[in-house]
Amino acid sequence: MFKKVTILIFFFLIFFVSFEDLYSKDEYFLTLRNEKVNLRQGPSFDYPVKILYKKKFLPVLIQDSSDNFRKIRDHENNSGWVHISQLSKKKAAIVIEEELILFGKSTIFSNPVALLKEGRLVKISKCKIKWCKVKTGKYNGWVSKNGLWGLL
Protein backbone atom coordinates (compact mmCIF):
# COMPACT_ATOMS: atom_id res chain seq x y z
CA MET A 1 0.00 0.00 0.00
CA PHE A 2 2.77 2.42 0.96
CA LYS A 3 4.58 1.67 -2.29
CA LYS A 4 1.46 2.47 -4.36
CA VAL A 5 0.93 5.79 -2.55
CA THR A 6 4.57 6.75 -3.07
CA ILE A 7 4.38 5.96 -6.78
CA LEU A 8 1.12 7.90 -7.08
CA ILE A 9 2.66 10.96 -5.40
CA PHE A 10 5.71 10.70 -7.64
CA PHE A 11 3.60 10.68 -10.82
CA PHE A 12 1.49 13.55 -9.50
CA LEU A 13 4.61 15.64 -9.02
CA ILE A 14 5.92 14.81 -12.47
CA PHE A 15 2.71 15.56 -14.36
CA PHE A 16 1.17 18.41 -12.39
CA VAL A 17 4.07 20.36 -10.93
CA SER A 18 6.65 22.03 -13.12
CA PHE A 19 10.19 21.66 -11.81
CA GLU A 20 10.92 25.12 -13.15
CA ASP A 21 8.23 26.52 -10.86
CA LEU A 22 9.82 24.79 -7.88
CA TYR A 23 13.20 26.44 -8.43
CA SER A 24 12.53 29.74 -10.21
CA LYS A 25 12.80 32.96 -8.27
CA ASP A 26 10.69 34.96 -10.73
CA GLU A 27 13.33 37.69 -10.86
CA TYR A 28 13.56 39.85 -13.97
CA PHE A 29 15.16 43.09 -15.14
CA LEU A 30 13.57 46.46 -15.84
CA THR A 31 15.11 49.92 -16.20
CA LEU A 32 14.54 53.25 -14.50
CA ARG A 33 12.10 55.39 -16.49
CA ASN A 34 13.19 58.88 -15.37
CA GLU A 35 16.33 60.92 -14.74
CA LYS A 36 15.55 61.01 -11.00
CA VAL A 37 14.10 58.01 -9.15
CA ASN A 38 13.75 57.53 -5.39
CA LEU A 39 14.75 54.22 -3.83
CA ARG A 40 12.76 53.82 -0.61
CA GLN A 41 13.26 51.68 2.48
CA GLY A 42 9.79 50.17 2.20
CA PRO A 43 6.90 49.67 -0.24
CA SER A 44 5.10 52.99 0.31
CA PHE A 45 5.63 56.74 -0.12
CA ASP A 46 5.59 56.90 3.69
CA TYR A 47 9.02 55.25 3.89
CA PRO A 48 12.14 57.45 3.72
CA VAL A 49 14.30 57.70 0.60
CA LYS A 50 17.53 55.68 0.79
CA ILE A 51 19.05 56.65 -2.56
CA LEU A 52 18.21 59.14 -5.30
CA TYR A 53 19.12 57.58 -8.65
CA LYS A 54 20.11 60.06 -11.36
CA LYS A 55 20.56 57.73 -14.32
CA LYS A 56 17.72 57.09 -16.76
CA PHE A 57 17.60 53.52 -18.16
CA LEU A 58 19.69 52.13 -15.27
CA PRO A 59 18.94 48.38 -15.18
CA VAL A 60 17.51 47.02 -11.94
CA LEU A 61 16.67 43.48 -10.85
CA ILE A 62 13.07 43.08 -9.69
CA GLN A 63 13.01 40.79 -6.65
CA ASP A 64 9.58 41.24 -5.08
CA SER A 65 6.34 43.20 -5.35
CA SER A 66 3.86 44.83 -3.01
CA ASP A 67 0.85 46.62 -4.50
CA ASN A 68 2.29 49.37 -6.73
CA PHE A 69 5.88 49.02 -5.51
CA ARG A 70 8.67 46.72 -6.65
CA LYS A 71 11.67 45.65 -4.60
CA ILE A 72 14.77 46.19 -6.72
CA ARG A 73 18.51 45.58 -6.57
CA ASP A 74 21.03 47.52 -8.63
CA HIS A 75 24.46 46.48 -9.97
CA GLU A 76 26.11 47.70 -6.75
CA ASN A 77 23.82 45.51 -4.58
CA ASN A 78 21.79 48.45 -3.25
CA SER A 79 18.22 47.32 -2.66
CA GLY A 80 14.95 48.98 -1.78
CA TRP A 81 11.51 49.80 -3.13
CA VAL A 82 10.49 51.82 -6.22
CA HIS A 83 7.01 52.79 -7.43
CA ILE A 84 6.02 50.99 -10.65
CA SER A 85 5.50 54.31 -12.46
CA GLN A 86 9.28 54.82 -12.26
CA LEU A 87 10.10 51.58 -14.10
CA SER A 88 10.32 50.82 -17.82
CA LYS A 89 10.55 47.66 -19.93
CA LYS A 90 13.26 49.17 -22.15
CA LYS A 91 16.38 47.00 -22.20
CA ALA A 92 19.71 48.31 -20.96
CA ALA A 93 22.78 46.99 -19.17
CA ILE A 94 25.85 48.15 -17.28
CA VAL A 95 29.39 47.16 -18.28
CA ILE A 96 30.83 45.16 -15.37
CA GLU A 97 34.24 44.31 -16.82
CA GLU A 98 37.12 46.74 -16.44
CA GLU A 99 37.20 47.10 -20.23
CA LEU A 100 34.80 45.66 -22.80
CA ILE A 101 35.41 45.82 -26.55
CA LEU A 102 32.54 46.97 -28.75
CA PHE A 103 32.79 45.11 -32.07
CA GLY A 104 31.24 45.91 -35.45
CA LYS A 105 29.78 42.38 -35.73
CA SER A 106 28.97 39.59 -33.30
CA THR A 107 32.40 37.96 -33.51
CA ILE A 108 35.78 38.70 -31.96
CA PHE A 109 37.25 38.62 -35.47
CA SER A 110 35.36 41.77 -36.57
CA ASN A 111 36.73 45.28 -36.27
CA PRO A 112 36.68 46.88 -32.82
CA VAL A 113 34.55 50.03 -32.70
CA ALA A 114 35.21 51.30 -29.17
CA LEU A 115 36.52 50.32 -25.76
CA LEU A 116 33.84 50.55 -23.06
CA LYS A 117 34.86 51.13 -19.45
CA GLU A 118 33.33 49.60 -16.34
CA GLY A 119 30.09 51.32 -15.30
CA ARG A 120 29.15 52.42 -18.83
CA LEU A 121 25.41 52.26 -19.55
CA VAL A 122 24.43 50.63 -22.86
CA LYS A 123 20.99 50.37 -24.46
CA ILE A 124 20.26 46.92 -25.85
CA SER A 125 18.74 46.46 -29.32
CA LYS A 126 18.79 42.66 -29.41
CA CYS A 127 20.73 39.70 -28.06
CA LYS A 128 21.95 36.41 -29.44
CA ILE A 129 23.28 33.49 -27.41
CA LYS A 130 26.59 35.13 -26.44
CA TRP A 131 26.34 38.63 -27.93
CA CYS A 132 24.19 41.74 -27.58
CA LYS A 133 23.78 44.57 -30.07
CA VAL A 134 24.07 47.81 -28.09
CA LYS A 135 24.15 51.57 -28.45
CA THR A 136 26.02 53.92 -26.17
CA GLY A 137 26.60 57.56 -26.96
CA LYS A 138 27.50 57.78 -30.65
CA TYR A 139 28.66 54.15 -30.86
CA ASN A 140 26.74 51.09 -32.09
CA GLY A 141 28.00 47.53 -32.12
CA TRP A 142 28.15 44.14 -30.47
CA VAL A 143 29.50 43.18 -27.04
CA SER A 144 29.89 39.92 -25.18
CA LYS A 145 26.97 39.19 -22.83
CA ASN A 146 29.42 38.07 -20.15
CA GLY A 147 30.62 41.65 -19.66
CA LEU A 148 27.14 43.05 -18.95
CA TRP A 149 24.88 43.28 -15.88
CA GLY A 150 21.17 43.60 -16.55
CA LEU A 151 20.38 40.46 -18.54
CA LEU A 152 19.06 37.05 -17.58
Regions found by a protein language model. Name each.
Residues 21-41, 51-56, 63-138, 145-152:
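SH3-family beta-barrel domains
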Residues 43-47:
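Second-shell loop/turn segments in exported
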Residues 1-9:
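Bacterial N-terminal signal peptides that target proteins for export
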